[in-house]
Amino acid sequence: MSWIKNVTESPTSLIKKVSCGLIIAASLYAIAPSLSALVFGDSKQSIGKYTTVGLINRGNDCFITSSLQGLAGIPRFVEYLKRIRTVLLELETKLSNNAKGDNPTVDNTTRHSRLENSSNSLAPLHESLTSLILDLISVKDRKTSISPKIVINTLESIFKSKISSKQNDAHEFTLILLQTLQEERSKLIDYSKQICNLNIPKFPFEGETSKFLVCLKCKGLSEPSYKQTFIRELSVPQQTSENLSNILAHDETEIIDDYSCLICQIRAILNHEEYRNFKDCTPDEILMLDRLKNYATKAPINENLPFEVEQYVKRYSKGNLQVSNIKGKVIKKDVVVQLPDILIVHLSRSTFNGITYSRNPCNVKFGERITLSEYTLAESGTITENRQVKYNLKSVVKHTGSHSSGHYMCYRRKTEIRFGKEDESSFRRAPVVNNEVNKNREQNVAHNDYKKSRYKKVKNALRYPYWQISDTAIKESTASTVLNEQKYAYMLYYERVNK
């Protein structure tokens, strides 16, 4: 500090005093953060350069790595896995207490042995995914990659078969994954009812669609059929480009020609007999016509009629009216009656020319936000829009190459950086490879979940809101880059905004 003494002891003047003050002020400003850290401790954790976690590709596993990264980018799915984990731990505690005569002290031996052998677990795939995905969404200060084999081994154990080493499809893998998760959840519900009624979270991917026909002439509806869905399947049109919203709208309707509408046929018979004043109708036929009047106002257009009524309608031919010739156009509608919390859209790009399959290069224009409608089908046959639901884009899986080969990669939206730790010692760890320390050695890394977490939004996330992940290769990406993947977008992952 001699330089400060020299300055202060030199002949004084107004200018020198001012200069001295400025120098001291600047020095204090520079060292103040260090002094604060020494006295009060570091109140902020420095982020600096950071990255996320990649997945190791064993050879042709890009369909697995991209699918898992896509799911990891959805906060609601992560929350669902955590809630299932809590249910499993509560069940385990309950069983342990019952076995020990309600002793509140829980021995971890059973827990660890069960988790080591996924086949003995109530929900092995849930546990494997929880372990892996919590590692994937963690933030690292150096390049880090882990193996997806914890999930692969669990699936192979469940299905008792090996996953093919050949090129596979990301959509098919994701569908199998979701179906298996739902089956595990159903078993967990049944099992928990036997022990204690626990609050099992709703499966966030579950939606429901209804298919039915609408006659363009009589406006009658067919009997609707309902289907549980996990992924929205869309056929990409064979054209240069199209908006996702238009594909969704077109997917809900299809025109069918030459359809034999039962209601139109019955009404034609009744009108014709009234015009003829029921000439030459026998008493039995009059009774039959009375029965038809009930069907004409209440029945669906595809009603399964009693045999004798069906035969009368089919064979009716009087004067210039032959019922078999009455045909018209109907609209085949496929509407959503229950929208999921997490919407996965599969853009099917397969085209068949009668001989071979090829890849459809149509540019599908999609946005970071979409709004979908949910409908209600009343018993009266009316269709009403129930509500509109907004979704935000969280992940995109793209595919480059041909129909039969190529490469999958994922864009995953960044989440907030979280600080803080939570004990995760009861859960299995995914093998990790630290590329800067040892590229050839796998080691176990303990995942640090977040208890009393502090959240911080990184400035760079505003400019580069997405991770671009190709197996172990990771870099940041802008929103415009993601939205420009119109030619290669294969699966879109949206999360519900308003619940």
Swiss-Prot record:
Molecular function terms, GO-annotated: cysteine-type deubiquitinase activity
Entry-linked SUPFAM superfamilies: Cysteine proteinases
Note from the entry: Present with 450 molecules/cell in log phase SD medium.
Gene Ontology CC annotations of this record: mitochondrial outer membrane; mitochondrion
UniProt similarity note: Belongs to the peptidase C19 family.
EC assignment: 3.4.19.12
Keywords: Hydrolase, Protease, Thiol protease, Ubl conjugation pathway
Catalyses which reaction(s): Thiol-dependent hydrolysis of ester, thioester, amide, peptide and isopeptide bonds formed by the C-terminal Gly of ubiquitin (a 76-residue protein attached to proteins as an intracellular targeting signal)
Protein origin, superkingdom: Eukaryota
Pfam hit, one: UCH
Top-tier EC class: hydrolase
Domain USP: 53-497
Gene3D superfamilies: Cysteine proteinases (3.90.70.10)
DNA damage among keywords: no
InterPro entries named in the record: Papain-like_cys_pep_sf (IPR038765), Peptidase_C19 (IPR050164), Peptidase_C19_UCH (IPR001394), USP_CS (IPR018200), USP_dom (IPR028889)
This protein's name: Ubiquitin carboxyl-terminal hydrolase 16
Active site: 62 (nucleophile), 407 (proton acceptor)
Listed GO biological process terms: protein deubiquitination; proteolysis
